[in-house]
């Protein structure tokens, strides 16, 4: 089993000082930096674009785990790759050809991820699993931080864990939404090996970040 990677979501950071926040979570032990990109069209919120990702890049050497909640998504893949994304994760619903989107991400030399909304079945992975480096399971409906974990997603995580193990490939299984010490434990038990945490990481300000990350890692 891989050690669990913690990917703090900067959606919960102080947007007025994002560079400082990224340096603080890096120092606190974050494995990846999770960047939630929302367009107000695919999801009901607007967050950040490639320019901010690029501005944050000099602040850390940790991998940028960029989750694109935008539609159409293909037009922006190059921009996020150039801005410094390491993993680019896309929704099957965000364009007509998820296979093509994943192919393009790989052609840019980036890790390709696919993300499943709460109602999107694990079966969606049947014909694309061999292309992906990461599967992200949304345990809340995407758009906002601070939501409650949707328990039905544990069954989906377990099903995807079986699919990944059967594939024999090294694919990360990440979970995003409502992650705290309690739900982190459930997600890990179901088979997750990477956790996105916004509220649970950034609660209490910079002095608490290391303890917050440690609590999730030890869940």
Can you annotate each of these PLM segments?
Residues 4-9, 33-35, 56, 64-68, ...:
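Hydrophobic faces of well-ordered beta-strands that scaffold small-molecule active sites
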Residues 27-32, 85, 132, 192:
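A structural motif
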Residues 18, 25, 36, 80, ...:
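Conserved, mostly hydrophobic/aromatic
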Residues 41-73, 77, 184-201:
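A short alpha/beta connector and helix-capping loop motif
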Residues 105, 188, 202-219:
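C-terminal helical cap(s) of enzyme catalytic domains, especially alpha/beta-barrels
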Residues 32-50, 92, 140-148, 201-203:
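Glycine-rich, proline-tolerant flexible connector loops at the mouths of alpha/beta enzymes
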Residues 22, 74-82, 120-132, 177-195:
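Catalytic cores of alpha/beta
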Residues 14-17, 59, 75-79, 85-172:
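Conserved anion-binding
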């Amino acid at each position: 089993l891989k050690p669990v990677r913690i990917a703090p979501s900067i959606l919960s950071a102080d947007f007025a000082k994002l560079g400082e926040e990224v340096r603080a979570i890096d120092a606190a032990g974050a494995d990846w930096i999770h960047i939630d990109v929302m367009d107000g069209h695919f999801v009901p919120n607007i967050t950040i674009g490639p320019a901010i990702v690029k501005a944050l890049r000099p602040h850390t050497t940790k991998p940028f785990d960029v989750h694109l909640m935008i539609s159409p998504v293909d037009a922006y893949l190059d921009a996020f790759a150039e801005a410094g994304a390491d993993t680019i994760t896309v929704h099957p619903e965000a364009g007509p050809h998820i296979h093509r989107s994943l192919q393009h991400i790989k052609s840019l030399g980036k890790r390709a991820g696919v993300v499943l909304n709460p109602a999107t079945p694990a079966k969606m992975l049947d014909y694309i699993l061999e292309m992906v480096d990461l599967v992200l399971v949304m345990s809340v409906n995407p758009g906002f931080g601070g939501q409650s974990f949707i328990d039905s997603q544990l069954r989906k995580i377990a099903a995807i864990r079986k699919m990944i193990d059967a594939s024999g490939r090294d694919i990360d299984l990440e979970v995003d939404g409502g992650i705290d010490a309690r739900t982190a434990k459930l997600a890990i038990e179901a088979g997750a090996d990477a956790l996105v945490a916004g509220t649970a990481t950034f609660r209490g300000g910079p002095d608490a970040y290391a303890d917050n990350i440690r609590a999730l890692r030890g869940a």
